[in-house]
Swiss-Prot record:
Its cofactor is NAD(+). The lineage of its organism: Bacteria, Pseudomonadati, Pseudomonadota, Alphaproteobacteria, Hyphomicrobiales. It comes from Brucella melitensis biotype 2 (strain ATCC 23457). Binds 1 NAD(+) per subunit. One of its GO terms (molecular function) is adenosylhomocysteinase activity. It is found in: Cytoplasm. The gene is ahcY. NAD(+) binds at residues 193-195, 227, 256-261, 279, 314, 335-337, 380. This is Adenosylhomocysteinase. It catalyses: S-adenosyl-L-homocysteine + H2O = L-homocysteine + adenosine. One of its GO terms (cellular component) is cytosol. Gene3D superfamilies: Adenosylhomocysteinase-like, NAD(P)-binding Rossmann-like Domain.
């Protein structure tokens, strides 16, 4: 990167390829295209300076260009070291949008690129964050706490934190007061995924959330579609591209049966695998059992599994002891946001053989081997290309609406976490029906009055479970 080249991508010559795929993706993303049509003239994001941290895929490229059509300035990095599609990053960089994303980043590069999305040429700060997993938000908040004199950088708990804290110290030395100034300038953040939302709620509970946040993840048109139907298609895609293994007849264990776990279990079952589920929540466990899956503990199931996938958003779900029990050539992977669901660090002293990018063969002293996908990070994005465009259109339309809401109506929100209102959730769904040839039935005035709604909706209460 130079002063005249405000981007970092693998190969800018891939831009034409990326643009061709972008053109196809736009035809599969009716929500984002409708947002351009509705808001393009009014420019509701004019003046917005958005720092985006979200997987730099073809679908994300359509989101970025939608934000720009609506008036925003954007700087972008990927939220995962393996999830970037290099041709997508090149296509965006070629349009003049600063993007810092390469498939296969080091942790040092990852946090440098996260820092770069806040470094505008005029030296002024960002005023919005669009986040996936919370790393961009946490970078600013931890840095501001360090500038205030809190001892938050002296005791890293992981290799990732070591690198993060080093980057914060580097920025503090280069630009004193940077984090405090940046934190004060943020009008709000929209957060894409379960893990990042959990971080925001923890901050709110502690009284440490300094600006409003919109929880995009818990919009119905995100969690019940992206998390479920997206994983239903992309999990098996990632395993197949990574291993070429036949899944029919294999024993697959899915750790967790939330929305991501449900989609993952259906994905593997659809491929012919014999699926078992682990759960800590009795309600989700009962759902899994009544959906026809055997509910087990990983302690009991590890020795018979051919494939084990984590979907929980928790840490240490697959331990080194579990992996010692697994059979030779068991496939181990994760489709939750962070890599700490699997105790990958405990494997580092074993023999690793890289088979191909994001596929490693790990050999134990007794000769047993495991196939680890994407080093325990998101395998559907590391080993494949993530969710299909159509389902991401719904998620990203929520992101756009959330950005508009927080940027244009900042004073209407306290420093708390919010979910988009039901009428906007229904609007997002409505925008995607025509593409599937679906036709809505219209309530009569009498029918609407009978159930206490209007013919135009919203049709369900806020607490309704879809």
């Amino acid at each position: 990167m130079t002063a005249s080249q405000d981007f970092v991508v693998k190969d800018i010559s891939l831009a034409d390829w990326g643009r061709r795929e972008l053109d196809i993706a736009e035809t599969e993303m009716p929500g984002l295209m409708a947002a351009r049509e509705e808001f393009g003239k009014s420019q509701p994001l004019k003046g917005a300076r958005i720092s985006g941290s979200l997987h730099m895929t073809i679908q994300t490229a359509v989101l970025i260009e939608t934000l720009k059509v609506l008036g925003a300035e954007v700087r972008w990095a990927s939220c995962n070291i393996f999830s970037t599609q290099d041709h997508a990053a090149a296509a965006i960089a070629a349009t003049g949008t600063p993007v810092f994303a390469v498939k296969g980043e080091t942790l040092e590069e990852y946090w440098t690129y996260t820092d770069q999305i806040f470094q505008w040429p005029d030296g002024e700060p960002s005023n919005m964050i669009l986040d996936d997993g919370g790393d961009a938000t946490m970078y600013i908040l931890i840095g501001a706490r360090a500038e205030a004199g809190e001892d938050v950088l002296s005791n890293p708990q992981s290799e990732e934190e070591e690198v993060l804290f080093a980057q914060i110290k580097k920025r503090m030395a280069a630009t004193p007061g940077f984090f405090t100034k940046q934190r004060a300038a943020i009008k709000g953040v929209t957060e894409e995924t379960t893990t990042g939302v959990n971080r925001l709620y923890q901050l709110q509970k502690k009284g440490l959330l300094p600006f409003p946040a919109i929880n995009v993840n818990d919009s119905v048109t995100k969690s019940k579609f992206d998390n479920k139907y997206g994983c239903k298609e992309s999990l098996v895609d990632g395993i197949r591209r990574g291993t070429d293994v036949m899944m029919a007849g294999k024993v697959a264990v899915v750790c967790g049966y939330g929305d991501v776990g449900k989609g993952s279990a259906q994905s593997l079952a659809g491929a012919g695998a014999r699926v078992k589920v682990t759960e800590v929540d009795p309600i989700c466990a009962l759902q899994a059992a009544m959906d026809g899956f055997e509910v087990v503990t990983l302690d009991d199931a590890a020795s018979t599994a051919d494939i084990v996938v984590t979907t929980t958003g928790n840490k240490d779900v697959i331990t080194i002891d579990h992996m010692r029990k697994m059979k030779d050539m068991c496939i181990v992977g994760n489709i939750g946001h962070f890599d700490n669901e699997i105790q990958v660090a405990a494997l580092r002293n074993l023999k690793w053989t890289n088979v191909k990018p994001q596929v490693d063969l790990i050999e134990f002293p007794d000769g047993k081997r495991l196939i680890l996908l994407s080093e325990g990070r998101l395998l559907n994005l590391g080993n494949a290309t993530g969710h299909p465009s159509f389902v991401m259109s719904a998620s990203f339309t929520n992101q756009v609406l959330g950005q508009i809401e927080l940027f244009t109506r900042t004073d209407a929100y306290k420093n708390e976490v919010y979910v988009l209102p039901k009428h906007l959730d229904e609007k997002v769904a409505r925008l995607h029906l025509d593409k599937l040839g679906a036709k809505l039935t219209v309530l009569s005035e009498e029918q609407a009055a009978y159930i206490g709604v209007t013919p135009q909706g919203p049709f369900k209460s806020e607490h309704y479970r879809y």
